[in-house]
């Protein structure tokens, strides 16, 4: 069986699946009690000091630069790929290594099922929740450095659904190509976005942008993928999220 590793980005203690396919990694330079032997994103070649704005991508960068695996993936300590089974304890729904391997026999990439915003496009949802200037910067970067990606970018921005959460599993050669492109776009975006003026939430700007860039890269490069459901280990408070979603849409005033 191929060597498959899914990094579990963590910044605090939390219950973890025991399956060997999962590799917890402490992000942002934190030291979690009881996890002294876990991976850390501030060792080797890293961008750990950017965790505030890059979120779980600092774990991805570390894995890309420092971890040898035939397939490498990224999940979050509160959300995982799930097996296809109704009901039961949320923790028991986390996909096993065997199930991840079976999914990879169908395609070289696993993505989470698409999130649908229904009444918002990817573009309008972003500018209502964050800052339009972020997307303006990305579009300019693509136009200047990666013009072949502009058609997919326009298509993705115009859709009401997309793959979110910065969750995926990729064959190593595909991951190398994706990370090379994505981190270059984000590095260029850092030169153009003044994230220091953002609050803590919007300061996670490069993590948010990467969520929207994944589909752009996948489509431009015609990468085959399969999807798995996502299990959230904590309650999602959908009513509260829905109310905030509509409130942002109604009150939007940014140019």
What would you call each of these model-derived segments?
Residues 1-255:
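ER/Golgi luminal nucleotide-sugar-dependent glycosyltransferases, focusing on the catalytic module
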């Amino acid at each position: 069986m191929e060597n498959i590793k899914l990094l579990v980005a963590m910044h605090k203690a939390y219950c973890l699946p025991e399956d060997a396919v999962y590799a917890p990694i402490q992000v942002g330079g934190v030291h979690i009690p009881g996890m002294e032997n876990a991976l850390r994103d501030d060792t080797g070649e890293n961008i750990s000091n950017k965790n505030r704005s890059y979120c779980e991508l600092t774990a991805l960068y570390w894995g890309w630069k420092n971890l040898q695996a035939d397939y490498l993936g990224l999940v979050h300590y509160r959300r995982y790929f799930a097996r296809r089974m109704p009901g039961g304890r949320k923790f028991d729904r986390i996909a096993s290594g065997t199930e991840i391997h079976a999914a990879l026999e169908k395609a070289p990439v696993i993505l989470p099922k698409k999130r649908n915003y229904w009444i918002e496009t990817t573009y309008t949802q972003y500018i209502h929740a964050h800052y339009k200037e972020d997307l303006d910067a990305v579009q300019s970067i693509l136009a200047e450095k990666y013009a072949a990606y502009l058609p997919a970018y326009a298509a993705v921005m115009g859709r009401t659904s997309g793959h979110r959460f910065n969750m995926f599993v990729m064959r190593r050669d595909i991951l190398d190509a994706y990370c090379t492109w994505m981190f270059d776009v984000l590095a260029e975006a850092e030169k153009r976005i003044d994230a220091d003026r953002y609050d803590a939430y919007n300061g996670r700007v490069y993590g948010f942008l990467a969520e929207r860039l994944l589909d752009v890269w996948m489509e431009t490069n015609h990468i085959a993928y399969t999807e798995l459901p996502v299990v959230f280990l904590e309650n999602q408070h959908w009513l509260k999220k829905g109310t905030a979603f509509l409130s942002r849409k109604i009150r939007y005033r940014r140019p």
